[in-house]
Each structure stands twice: as structure tokens, then as C-alpha cells.
Amino acid sequence: MEAAHSKSTEECLSYFGVSETTGLTPDQVKRHLEKYGPNELPAEEGKSLWELVVEQFEDLLVRILLLAACISFVLAWFEEGEETVTAFVEPFVILLILIANAIVGVWQERNAENAIEALKEYEPEMGKVYRADRKSVQRIKARDIVPGDIVEVAVGDKVPADIRILSIKSTTLRVDQSILTGESVSVIKHTDPVPDPRAVNQDKKNMLFSGTNIAAGKAVGIVATTGVSTEIGKIRDQMAATEQDKTPLQQKLDEFGEQLSKVISLICVAVWLINIGHFNDPVHGGSWFRGAIYYFKIAVALAVAAIPEGLPAVITTCLALGTRRMAKKNAIVRSLPSVETLGCTSVICSDKTGTLTTNQMSVCKMFIIDKVDGDICSLNEFSITGSTYAPEGEVLKNDKPVRAGQYDGLVELATICALCNDSSLDFNETKGVYEKVGEATETALTTLVEKMNVFNTEVRSLSKVERANACNSVIRQLMKKEFTLEFSRDRKSMSVYCSPAKSSRAAVGNKMFVKGAPEGVIDRCNYVRVGTTRVPLTGPVKEKIMSVIKEWGTGRDTLRCLALATRDTPPKREEMVLDDSAKFMEYEMDLTFVGVVGMLDPPRKEVTGSIQLCRDAGIRVIMITGDNKGTAIAICRRIGIFSENEEVADRAYTGREFDDLPLAEQREACRRACCFARVEPSHKSKIVEYLQSYDEITAMTGDGVNDAPALKKAEIGIAMGSGTAVAKTASEMVLADDNFSTIVAAVEEGRAIYNNMKQFIRYLISSNVGEVVCIFLTAALGLPEALIPVQLLWVNLVTDGLPATALGFNPPDLDIMDRPPRSPKEPLISGWLFFRYMAIGGYVGAATVGAAAWWFLYAEDGPHVSYHQLTHFMQCTEHNPEFDGLDCEVFEAPEPMTMALSVLVTIEMCNALNSLSENQSLLRMPPWVNIWLLGSICLSMSLHFLILYVDPLPMIFKLRALDFTQWLMVLKISLPVIGLDELLKFIARNYLEG
């Protein structure tokens, strides 16, 4: 049944053709079950494990590597002699890399799907219904409840479906619906229709929502919707429909991969075509087919050389290290790739309650009457420090500390706060903080009593557990609470009836203490308390009191005000009818006004500084709250989202105002606005969509089930540590301390991580460019192989991987939070950088080939062949006069390969030093600023020595140990790369960056 909240109870009953007393007939139940289906959220149809595995191989680079592995595997079958071990190592290693990558990918995907399953925990198991086949109420499984069922709920129950309340069987019915609406206090329900068909969930005061909890009272209602049609079901559908987008870096790497695969394909084809004339060379035994296979192997080597196999592992390691650093700052990252996305966040949409504020109501102002002279009335106004439930803070008058006990009015005010109250404070020893037990508003009053300490109780020697309620206990010993007249909507107040304790001399007779909404309480006051006397309440005095309350309730503070009053001579206990709440108003008459307290959910101390940091970093902060607009704007002014006197007409909207705008203006509003009040979860998703249409990268916070769709849709969903399991599983990050400042720290970390990733991605790619140039040159010039795939894999994975990982430890730039967020479209490698890598890569390739050629042409222990013989080595046979006196086996010697590999590794170590900074010289930023990098370079070189000097590794890698002169040559060829890069950095600094 749609819009059940706007219908009367009679309309709801007749819509389903049911009576409130008997319930549905078995026949109706059957029909409704067929029509509406069972009352449960369908399980999510997740992808099968096989589908997830196949998805990991949709990447072009992965497919090229897979093809290369298959081809090498086939070729390895046909190898003979010693070669076979080496030949099988290569496809085996490639497959291992691919399997490892696929496992990581599948694991991450699996995590993402748990969000929808977590909604299940809010499904109630059982429900209590009235049906025509039984006289009394019966318990049935919640999934069997159908629309039209008459359901009974009582305190402690979980609501089994969306229910329109028919009758309330207790004084009040309070429901905790924070999981759905994010409201921090429980909501009082009623049975009257809510005439607005577009009312937000917070305003549907006659509805109970599936999955919420009954906090107090008992009621009977009719089921309006079940299963997916309930509010929680709609949330599930929104989540199921939300597709996860790739992070900016993932998109960049995908684009890069596609370009790279096209380039690889072109180069492979080019190498084949250049050498097509060599297919018949004698070295292949004159067989065209074997020649083709040989060049096929070179093409495979090229593919292996061009793909940075170590990159996924290095990125994962760097992100994992980043998440550890973030965890120390209370930001727990659930999805690794999102660490980098944080770096380009341009908008943070934050909840107000608990994130920007402490979610700990605290009294910050109060007043009592100072004196009344005819119609002239003066007040004593006080402010109170401290913004949490901790019983620490001072009472100030005119900004100077005062002792509350010296004001009689404050003693009585503290008495009312302590007695007209069912809550208390509790010191949580594991967390080391004070927490509320009971309602937030009442706990604020309990804390106020502790701060006031009107009877000068000795509290310094008490432990924190004893300190929690010390002053309240003293007051409660003086007066004994007999009974409570519960809060009700019509009188908007509650009261307690107290009698003096036996030993007490303080109070003379019985008293009634009242607290409630100021207008309601003051209307029932005939007197005001001045010191210890009472004075009749006149019109002008009442006006003065109401004007201060109005001033506190609007303007900068927008405090929530409570009036406190006493009935000095209440009726006798036995004359009061306590089970008829309609009579409560009569008993709370003839009151004496004592004072007013103003409370708010105060902003966190560190938030103002964080918002300024965001402003400096070019990040817009938008506050989104279910609170009313006045309170929202006031908090925005307090924390610096709006300045004190800024005009906010087109920068703050309620959910309703936003909906009333035409679509184009809604989109425009999201571009300007910094405050949305009275919003529903669906608005959050809409706001994220509009922001994304402007290419903004949005971080969205939330803690309730209702926030889950928006958390899933935003690039960065941020759940609160105290939030629901659904919100946590739908998010990328969880704030352990629920603190807005933690988000800003995480953004800073994200920016630093991205900068470091840029450095090592570029470092690894320039290494691959060098390898490709090397293989291309050997093939184009007709030289013997300088590097084989197994060696390339070793370099890409191990020797390059270690320094690349260490580059992730580069210290962040000092001005990292003074720059605007980078655009997600900013390329990883721009024009000039591309030229730089080609230049460095060209040098690496030429140096590697040069080192191999040097051994053939000039080395003391080399064969001293001529350049012509070297470039035509394929025609070498015993009968060819050009190669007289030369053993053709020499062209397959391991020494030139060892020279080439050693030069490649040494140059890469120099390149790692070059990558310490994008444009800073090594003289300005010396190697020891990143001690990890120096360590990893030493480790990489040690591993290189390992494969050169420790058997049987040289045989597997086809290498031979080098002597001192050969190592000197390696250094001579390698070190100039530092000079070359310094020159390119100098040009970039002085001529390209203005």
C-alpha cells in the first residue's frame, strides 16, 4: 500500500478488507502471499567463482602475457639438451604471476559483495500477528507476514515490516530508527494521518519501519508493505543497482595497458617483417619454418620485455603500506585501490551528527531569574564549557568561572536536572571515555549537574568510574523519586513526584519537578523563582523569558531549549490517577518557573582547523544532515563552512526545496551548495550523481543502513566505526574514531601515496622501454640475442621490483595540502615526461646492446669478431669463407648476455636514484632521504650477484661470472644515465616549469 502514512486508520483497514480485532482470514493470507511474495529480502545473486576468475583475464596485457606463456610452453616442448630447464622456467613464471594477480583480484571482488548480505542482520526472525484463525495473538516467522496483517509490537521488538500504527497501547511509543534515518534520539510515534504524501521518513510519525527497534511502549498496527517494498528493501535495491566504478588510477593503468598492447603488437610484427629475409639462414638448418619459430620466440621475448610484470605487486604493496599508515591515524581502509582515489577527492560530503559534531548533547548555556521589579526582570545567564559527556567543565558568568552553589536558583535547577531524569553516565574503561546510559538529552542534564557540583562534593580523589555520577547521587539522596509522569506529545513535558528523604532537612514537603518544551511549560507557570522566593509571573516577565529562549533557539546557536519548573504543593499521591495520561496535564499546573537550559550537539574541537585545511587544498566540504535547516546553517557557521555573515540563500537547501527545483537547477545547486538539511538517503545518492556529472571525485560519509546506497555510489564511501555493519561493508573506508579530521588526514596520505606511485610506475615503465629498445635493436641489426625472456622476467619482477617498492616510502612534499586536487583525467605520463622516458629508455637499450657487442668486438677474453661477422652471425657455417677460423658456437656464449644483463641492472639502480624526485636534482635531494631505497638497491645488486656466482643459477639464467675489468666496463657504460637524467631535469626545472 503506497503512502499509508497519509491515510486514516479506517482507510488502511478497508484497503486490505481487514478488521483490527480479528485480522486476516487464512484465505486472505494465501492470496496476499501470492500477490506480494514472502516478507524477506532476496539473497544477492553474486557472480560465481568461475565468472570472477574469467573476469581477471579480460585485461589486454594479461591476455598478451597468457598468449606468450602458451607459446613459450609449446616451444619448450621442442627444445633439446640443456636448454629444456631454462625453456620451461619462463612459461611457468609467467603463469605464476597471472595466477597470483587473479587471486588478489577475485578476493577484492568477493569483499565488495558482502554489503548487501549484511542487510540480512536487520531482518527480524519473528513477528506477533492477529489472524482470524486464532483468538489470541500468535508468533509466526517474520517471512510469513503479509500486507494487511494486524501486528503487535512492544518494547525490545524488531519491527517485522513497514507498519501503519492503528492504536498505541501505552502512554507513549518510542522507536529507535537511527539505522534507517540517522536520527540520534528515539522518535515518539502517534496514530494521526500525516497529510503530506511526499513526507520524508523522519516526518512519517505514524509509521514503523522494518528493521527498526521499539525503545518504549506497545502498539498495534497494520502491515503496509513487506519485503523489497519496505524502506529497507528499497535501500537493498538501490545497492544492488549500483555498479562499482574503477578508481582513477585503475582507469589510467587500463588505458596505458591498451596503448602498450597496441605498441607491442606493432613492434612484434615489425621485428618479424624486418627479419623475414633471415628465415632461411643456415643457423636455422635452412628450414624456413624453424627460422619463423626463432623470430616468434623473439616476439614473445618482446612481449615479456614490454609488460611491467612487477607493477601489480608493487602497487599492491605500496597501497598496503599506505593503509597501515592510515590505520595508525584511525582510518581503516577496506578496499586497497581507494587509497589512491582519496588523493584526488574534490568534494567531501559529511554527515553532521557524530562526524562534524561529537554526537554527545551538551548544555552550553542556562539562565535563572536574578530579580523581578514590577514588570522589569533581569536574568543571570551562564555558559558552560566542555563538549562531551565527560563530567569536566566550568560554569562561567560573563566569561569568568563562578561557583554554581552560591546561586540558589542553580541549586534548584541542578536538583530538577538530576531527579527529572532516567539517564546516567558510565565510564567505559576499555575505551577510556564517558558514555551515556539512556536518552542523549537527559544525559546532557546529568553531565551538567556533575559540572555544576552545587553541593561542593569532594570529587578529586574519586576514580573515573565513581566520578561519573557523584554529584547526581548526592542530590538523589536528598529527595526520593516516587513515580514518573511519562512524556506525552500533547503536553510536551514530563515530570517526577518526589518526597524528602528521611534524613534530609533540605526539602519541606513533596515536590513535583517538571521539564519540557519551553512554550508548553511556561504556559502552565503562575510564578517564577527568584533566589528562594517565588514571585507571580506577569506578562512582561514572560515576554522577557520567551525572547531570550527565541534568541537562543535561532541565530548563531540554534540551541535546543528545555524549561525547568517545580510544583511546590502537588496534589496528594492517592488523589492522582496514574494510568490515565490525559490527566497528567492537570497535575502539571500552577508551576513555578526555575530556569532554562540550552543544549546542542557541539562541533568537534578539531573540525574547524580541518575545514580550513580542506579549503587550502581546494576541497569543498558539504554538510548533509537530517536536522532542520536553522540548526544545520548554525553549525556550518560555527565550523567555518559558511562565514559568520555570509548570505546562504542559494548555498543551503532542505531536501524538499531541492526536490522542488527543476532538474537543471538541482544539478547547478549541487555545484554551489555546502549544506543540505532535512534530507533522505535518496537525496544523498542524487547529490553524488550530480557531483559526478561535474567530474568531481566525491567522498561520502554515513553510518546508517539508509546511507549504504550513497556510500556505494560515491568514489569513496566512508563509514563510521560506530555505524551499522551494512554501512561498513558498503564503504571503502571506516573511521575508527568517527572524526571528520581523520578524513582530511587520509586525503593527505592518499595524495602522498599517488605521488610516490607516479614515481615508481614511471621508473618501471622506463625500464621496460629500455628492454624493448634492446630487443628491437638486436633483431633489427641482426645481432645475437642480448637478453632472453627468463632474464627479463627476473629483472622486471625482482631486481626492479625492490627499488620500485622502496620508492613508495619517499617523504611527502611539504606543500601537498596547498595544491588543488589533481584532475582524475590528468595523464600519468605527459608529453615531456614521455620524451624523457623515451630518451632514458633509448639510452638503456643502446647501452645494453652495446655491452653485449663490446664483448664480441673488444673484450680481452672475447672472440674479436668483426662488426660484419657479428651482424651476419646467422650465416655462420663451417663452409662459409667469411667465418674462417671462427667457431660458430661463440655466438651463443653466455658472456655477452651476462654483460648486457649486468648493464641493465646497474642502469636500473641508477634510474631508481633518479626517481627520488620528478624534477629535483640528486644534489638537492640526496639518496639518503629515502633510506629504504638505498637498502633495496643493495639487496637487488646482491640478488644479481647471486644469479651470477651461485650454482646452479648461472645455468638456468644462461649466465657466466664476470671479472674485474668486465665490471669496470659495466660501470663505465651505466653511470652516464645519471648525468643524462640530471640534464633532462635541469631543462624541466628551468625552461618548462616557467
UniProtKB/Swiss-Prot annotation:
<dbReference type="InterPro" id="IPR023298">
    <property type="entry name" value="ATPase_P-typ_TM_dom_sf"/>
</dbReference>
<dbReference type="GO" id="GO:0005793">
    <property type="term" value="C:endoplasmic reticulum-Golgi intermediate compartment"/>
</dbReference>
<dbReference type="InterPro" id="IPR005782">
    <property type="entry name" value="P-type_ATPase_IIA"/>
</dbReference>
<feature type="binding site">
    <location>
        <position position="684"/>
    </location>
    <ligand>
        <name>ATP</name>
    </ligand>
</feature>
<dbReference type="GO" id="GO:0005338">
    <property type="term" value="F:nucleotide-sugar transmembrane transporter activity"/>
</dbReference>
<dbReference type="GO" id="GO:0030899">
    <property type="term" value="F:calcium-dependent ATPase activity"/>
</dbReference>
<dbReference type="GO" id="GO:0031673">
    <property type="term" value="C:H zone"/>
</dbReference>
<feature type="binding site">
    <location>
        <position position="796"/>
    </location>
    <ligand>
        <name>Ca(2+) 1</name>
    </ligand>
</feature>
<dbReference type="GO" id="GO:0016887">
    <property type="term" value="F:ATP hydrolysis activity"/>
</dbReference>
<dbReference type="GO" id="GO:0032471">
    <property type="term" value="P:negative regulation of endoplasmic reticulum calcium ion concentration"/>
</dbReference>
<dbReference type="InterPro" id="IPR001757">
    <property type="entry name" value="P_typ_ATPase"/>
</dbReference>
<dbReference type="GO" id="GO:0070296">
    <property type="term" value="P:sarcoplasmic reticulum calcium ion transport"/>
</dbReference>
<feature type="transmembrane region" description="Helical; Name=4">
    <location>
        <begin position="296"/>
        <end position="313"/>
    </location>
</feature>
<dbReference type="GO" id="GO:0042803">
    <property type="term" value="F:protein homodimerization activity"/>
</dbReference>
<dbReference type="GO" id="GO:0051561">
    <property type="term" value="P:positive regulation of mitochondrial calcium ion concentration"/>
</dbReference>
<dbReference type="InterPro" id="IPR018303">
    <property type="entry name" value="ATPase_P-typ_P_site"/>
</dbReference>
<dbReference type="GO" id="GO:0005739">
    <property type="term" value="C:mitochondrion"/>
</dbReference>
<feature type="binding site">
    <location>
        <position position="771"/>
    </location>
    <ligand>
        <name>Ca(2+) 2</name>
    </ligand>
</feature>
<feature type="binding site">
    <location>
        <position position="560"/>
    </location>
    <ligand>
        <name>ATP</name>
    </ligand>
</feature>
<feature type="topological domain" description="Lumenal">
    <location>
        <begin position="778"/>
        <end position="787"/>
    </location>
</feature>
<dbReference type="Pfam" id="PF00702">
    <property type="entry name" value="Hydrolase"/>
</dbReference>
<feature type="binding site">
    <location>
        <position position="305"/>
    </location>
    <ligand>
        <name>Ca(2+) 1</name>
    </ligand>
</feature>
<feature type="topological domain" description="Cytoplasmic">
    <location>
        <begin position="809"/>
        <end position="828"/>
    </location>
</feature>
<dbReference type="InterPro" id="IPR008250">
    <property type="entry name" value="ATPase_P-typ_transduc_dom_A_sf"/>
</dbReference>
<keyword id="KW-0547">Nucleotide-binding</keyword>
<keyword id="KW-0703">Sarcoplasmic reticulum</keyword>
<feature type="modified residue" description="Phosphoserine">
    <location>
        <position position="643"/>
    </location>
</feature>
<feature type="binding site">
    <location>
        <position position="307"/>
    </location>
    <ligand>
        <name>Ca(2+) 1</name>
    </ligand>
</feature>
<feature type="binding site">
    <location>
        <position position="309"/>
    </location>
    <ligand>
        <name>Ca(2+) 1</name>
    </ligand>
</feature>
<feature type="transmembrane region" description="Helical; Name=8">
    <location>
        <begin position="898"/>
        <end position="917"/>
    </location>
</feature>
<dbReference type="Pfam" id="PF13246">
    <property type="entry name" value="Cation_ATPase"/>
</dbReference>
<dbReference type="GO" id="GO:0006942">
    <property type="term" value="P:regulation of striated muscle contraction"/>
</dbReference>
<comment type="function">
    <text>Key regulator of striated muscle performance by acting as the major Ca(2+) ATPase responsible for the reuptake of cytosolic Ca(2+) into the sarcoplasmic reticulum. Catalyzes the hydrolysis of ATP coupled with the translocation of calcium from the cytosol to the sarcoplasmic reticulum lumen. Contributes to calcium sequestration involved in muscular excitation/contraction.</text>
</comment>
<dbReference type="GO" id="GO:0034976">
    <property type="term" value="P:response to endoplasmic reticulum stress"/>
</dbReference>
<keyword id="KW-0109">Calcium transport</keyword>
<dbReference type="GO" id="GO:0005509">
    <property type="term" value="F:calcium ion binding"/>
</dbReference>
<feature type="binding site">
    <location>
        <position position="489"/>
    </location>
    <ligand>
        <name>ATP</name>
    </ligand>
</feature>
<feature type="transmembrane region" description="Helical; Name=3">
    <location>
        <begin position="254"/>
        <end position="273"/>
    </location>
</feature>
<dbReference type="GO" id="GO:1901896">
    <property type="term" value="P:positive regulation of ATPase-coupled calcium transmembrane transporter activity"/>
</dbReference>
<keyword id="KW-0597">Phosphoprotein</keyword>
<feature type="transmembrane region" description="Helical; Name=10">
    <location>
        <begin position="965"/>
        <end position="985"/>
    </location>
</feature>
<dbReference type="GO" id="GO:0008637">
    <property type="term" value="P:apoptotic mitochondrial changes"/>
</dbReference>
